[in-house]
């Protein structure tokens, strides 16, 4: 996806020479067995740490601990509770999205952009929320709560039960507002035909997604807009890159962008947090206060998403976190403040405060 090239460039072209470290990158890993094989090969190559973007499990943490490697993951503890309940002394922590903040972006957008009576119809792609994906759960929850607050509606079922449904669900409510939940991964072959069939009814003028779907759904959305003479508002998550640029700069039949809100992660800041946790564990041990909370447990380091709502805003961000420009949001000053070698008194709370302080306005100021 669009995150991979800039993440690798950030590590290879900026982090490696700046902090005198080296990286070995895997090919695409299809399962845990492939991850295990890659880690074993890295052990044979003499690496000091593993940053796991794929499997993130106690099995991998144990393998690393048995061989003296620091282990850091991209993910969350909801899906991998053993990383909190088992004493992996080499485990540097978990880096993931500030899910409540991501969800609030969707809630705020709905408050500003949904109609006064809710007559447009809302189709919500819940992605992997039913399987427990924390980010997808929080976004779906924020959307349902946002609709509830805006229209003063009461759902027949609890929001938790609605989120947990693995079937297409029309959300019963006392105002009879059309709200439909469509679960499933957009990477599955069955996702697009299913969501297309719903959009083609012409009943939904707002399409919200807990995952990145605007690239898959753009064609059918445009076709339905032409057929019914409507403008379907689209809100999703995504990442800086050509896919996002195409989405905002592609106009539908009414002259509107094919997407209205995309909540993006800034790849360099996420990657900087993973590097900082790993580097601090290598220098001071994974049980240092830069990697552990006051309770002595591993920390969930979080990063904020940034809301993009126009092609003009995206133009202002041109060149940010781009391999071609090397103009990284998480520059040396930003990374240094999270490292024990530069800031010996830094704690895990300090690092989280640094990460959570980032907003579009703050980043714009940082980038000059």
Regions found by a protein language model. Give the residues of each.
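A residue-level marker of the well-folded mature domains of exported/periplasmic proteins
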Residues: 1-368
């Amino acid at each position: 996806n669009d995150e991979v090239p800039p993440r690798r460039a950030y590590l290879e072209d900026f982090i490696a020479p700046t902090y005198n470290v080296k990286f070995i990158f895997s090919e695409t890993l299809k399962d845990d067995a492939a991850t295990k094989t890659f880690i074993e090969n890295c052990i044979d190559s003499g690496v000091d740490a593993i940053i796991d973007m794929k499997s993130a499990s106690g099995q991998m943490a144990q393998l690393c601990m048995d061989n003296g490697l620091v282990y850091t993951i991209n993910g969350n503890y909801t899906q991998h509770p053993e990383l909190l309940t088992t004493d992996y002394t080499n485990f540097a922590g978990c880096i993931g999205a500030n899910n409540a903040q991501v969800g609030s972006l969707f809630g705020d957008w709905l408050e500003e952009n949904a109609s006064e009576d809710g007559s447009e119809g809302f189709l919500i792609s819940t992605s992997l929320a039913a399987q427990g994906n924390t980010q997808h759960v929080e976004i779906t929850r924020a959307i349902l709560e946002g609709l509830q607050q805006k229209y003063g509606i009461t759902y027949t079922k609890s929001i938790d039960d609605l989120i947990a449904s693995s079937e297409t669900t029309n959300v019963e409510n006392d105002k009879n507002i059309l709200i439909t939940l469509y679960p499933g991964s957009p990477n599955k072959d069955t996702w697009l035909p299913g969501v297309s069939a719903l959009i083609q009814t012409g009943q939904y003028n707002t399409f919200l997604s807990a995952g990145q779907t605007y690239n898959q759904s753009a064609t059918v959305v445009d076709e339905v807009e032409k057929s019914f003479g409507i403008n379907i508002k689209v809100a999703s998550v995504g990442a800086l890159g050509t896919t996002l640029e195409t989405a905002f700069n592609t106009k539908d039949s009414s002259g509107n962008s094919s997407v209205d809100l995309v909540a993006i992660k800034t790849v360099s800041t996420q990657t900087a947090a993973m590097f900082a946790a790993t580097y601090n564990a290598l220098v001071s041990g994974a049980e240092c206060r830069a990697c552990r909370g006051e309770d002595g447990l591993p920390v969930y380091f979080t990063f904020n998403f940034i809301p993009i709502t126009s092609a003009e805003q995206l133009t202002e961000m041109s060149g940010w976190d781009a391999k071609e420009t090397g103009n990284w949001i998480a520059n040396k000053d930003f990374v240094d403040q999270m490292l024990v070698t530069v800031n010996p008194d830094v704690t895990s709370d300090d690092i989280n405060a640094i990460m959570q302080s980032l907003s579009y306005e703050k980043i714009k100021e940082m980038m000059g």
